[in-house]
Structure formats: C-alpha cells, structure tokens
C-alpha cells in the first residue's frame, strides 16, 4: 500500500520580494523538517512576486539532497514545448533523477499572461495536449519527429535526457472534466486545487470510470498513478484569526474577494481541526498533499515547523 506523502509549496509573496537566501533557506528547512516534497507554483506575470518555477527548483535541488521537488503547476501552454522539455529534463538531470515531478496545468485565470506570451486563451487546452506529446518524445533523447496543429519538426533530439527512466512523472492539475480526462489518459497523476474533500472524491470516482472505459485501472496502490491535492493551510490556535488571515492572503493572491468562499477551500485553525480536515481528504482518496501557507508571510517558516510537528506527524500515524 502506498504511504500518504506530505509536501509544502513555497508561497507567493504578495507584498515584497523576498531575499534570495530566504527562498533557498525555505527549501533547506522543508527538508530538515521531514517534508516528503517541495513545490513551486508557476506564473509569468501575476498578482504578487513569483520567481521562475523550474529555475527555482534547480536551485532547491542544489541546496537539498533527497526531498522530492515539483511544480504545482507549470503553465505549459505559455511556453514552447521544446523549451519546457529541455528545462524540465535539466532539472531532473541536475537533481540526480527520481526526485522531480512535473506538475502541469492549462492556466487561464491570468489572462494578461496569455496576452504577454502571445497565446490565445481559447487554445490553452489543445496546446497543452500537444505539448505533453512533444515533451514525452523529446525526453527519450532519441531523434524524433512531430506533426501537429501548432508545432512541426523532424529528426530532432535533445540531450541529456532525464535521468529518471521514462522521464519525470507528469501530474495534471485542474478542476474540469477535461483536466481529469487528461490526467487519466496522458498523466501519471492528478493534482486538485481549491477543492473540497467531497468534490475531490467525486472527481476521483469520475477518473476511475474514465480509466475503466479506456486504459484499465488506475494503478494507485502500485505507486504508478497518484491522486494529489494542493491546499492552502494556516494552522493557528485562534480559528477566527486563521480564517481571517486566509481570506486576506487568498484575496491578495487572486486580486478578488475570497470572504464568501475561503472557508470552503482552506484548511485552517488549531492542529486538531486541521487534522480533521486532512482526514476528510485522506478518506476521499488523496495520496499526496501539497500545502501552501495561507497566513501572514512572516509566519511562513514558523508554519513549516508547526505543521511538521503538530499536524503531519500525527496525520501519518
């Protein structure tokens, strides 16, 4: 049986750009506190301050030794697939292999990002599907060709290939039926975002149905396909303060008012309440949690310790 894993995502910094050493220290501390995985979100131009996801993960790999690193999620349609394949393969290579998960999604909430990159928003799904096909071809390290709607090439290879046999696992993020189908048909896992436990269970049931009709069972317990959940979390003894802080964080992050819906998607409050919420997701089928700090930015490092010692250690037991 697959053991449930717990990861942490480096948070968006809505007000100030952190010093480089702060970002790298976060990675070291995540490994020191025993987290299974370390993640980066991805945006080209969004609300707040983001470093580039794959470049930052390469730096994380150099400052750590064994923690899994991953993108949650990399916005594939904003890049040419050959460039994405090359950089992702390099991250896998430099991290030593079997440490990198390439979480990808189609994006869309940041319309200006698509304008900036010259990509029509309406094409993002089709571009993602074709990009996955190209990336997998290029990761073989062999000479390959491709004829598609957006890209065409012949007799081209990229080296070095990823050290991970077959390439890094690709997890598909999203909340739509199309994303779930993409995760089953083209991915090695699925990662939900802004979901309730009930919605996650419903989505996983649909993915099992898709798999049974097309490719057979999802090999979850064999560790070959992973249902994951990305959740904002703020563990604090004062439940009201935790919720208020979470609303403020999410509202800044997305430049919209989350006061009416934050409670539905946040894990917040004292350790006991956070554990109860995590248990709901475990029963819904989550095998890998990716937490992102939803409280005041200055408390992010303190949360690393608190979550590890008071929540995750107990959730694993």
Please give the residue ranges for each predicted region.
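Active-site-adjacent structural elements that line small-molecule/cofactor binding pockets in enzymes
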Residues: 1-317
